[in-house]
Amino acid sequence: MAAVTALGSLPRVAAGQVRVFPPAPPAVSPVEGLIDFHVHSAPDVFGRAIDDDESAALYMARKAEAIVLKNHVVSTAGRAFLLRKHNPGVKAFGGIVLNGAVGGINPDAVQWMWRMQGGYGRLVWFPTFDADNHVKHFKDAPEGVKVVGADGKALPAVREVLKVCAQQKLIVCTGHASPPEALALIEAARDAGCDRIVVTHAEFEVVNMSVEQMKKAASMGAKLEICAMGPLMGPSAHLPWMRHWRQVTYKESAEHVRTVGAEHFILSTDLGQTGNPSQPDGYAMLIAGLMGQGITRDQIKLMGRETAGKLLMG
């Protein structure tokens, strides 16, 4: 019978050496101190992998600074209040998306949203999946909720919403508007006195701003959102519905940051869908991908904490 080899004589993996197993958890969480400006979680009408409490718990464990809850059909201002109440230490914010479920471009809906107990309803997204640009792009319907008229200028109802946003210092997000529509929204928002404006996932197919349009938006004071979901989409995406969206590569996003300037961007995930990475894991993937393309940790902090923090809490 062959002698049994002593365990101590087997070749060992040196401390810190990685072969076919994951490395040890990082000493410092990649998302520590950062803000996720675009979190999807249950309850929802769409499949979500985890709920508000679970999303917050994952981010708290990784020492993130704050999260923004987004839902396409209902306000999340009240959910942010409850999340904070049940999870001391969590900084959660919410808002409202002006889709058909809340009456479209509805100033009253915005008024009631920001009045919700706690005052954590801070964002107003213009239409997303009901946006005229979105439904026409994906051929979902002949027309959707419009934000501009035939003259390319913001509609009167849009201007009424923007007045409320200016009065209450709410963050105006362009939703799934086309680049010309988004620029018209930014112009109208500035005219109304709004100074907190975000171009929602500026790189995604349904928006897909050119570099020159990004520069124009930035020159008007808007911040541009980069989302962790972008690199997961495209023809080879692991989920069928994501194959309808163009992939946004880390290389692309890094080039936008270098060309337009890191000070004009914020970071988000747009994650929470069933089958996708958790929001913190997706955020870590985004950070690693951008840094792999030459973006520095200081630039990550600028986009993921400083700029986003000024919008939310400044």
Kindly give the residue locations of the regions a language model identified.
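An N-terminally biased module of ancient metal coordination in phosphate/nucleic-acid-related enzymes
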Residues: 18-91
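Short acidic/histidine-rich active-site segments
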Residues: 227, 262-279
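Hydrophobic faces of well-ordered beta-strands that scaffold small-molecule active sites
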Residues: 33-39, 67-69, 93-96, 124-126, ...
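Active-site environment of divalent metal-dependent phosphoester hydrolases
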Residues: 42-44, 74-78, 99-102, 131-134, ...
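Glycine-rich phosphate-binding "P-loop"
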Residues: 37-47, 129-131, 136-153
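Mid-to-C-terminal alpha-helical segments outside catalytic/metal-binding sites
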Residues: 1-7, 280-314
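Histidine/acidic residue-rich metal-binding segments in metalloenzymes
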Residues: 18, 25-26, 52-57, 79-82, ...
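N-terminal twin-arginine translocation
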Residues: 2-20
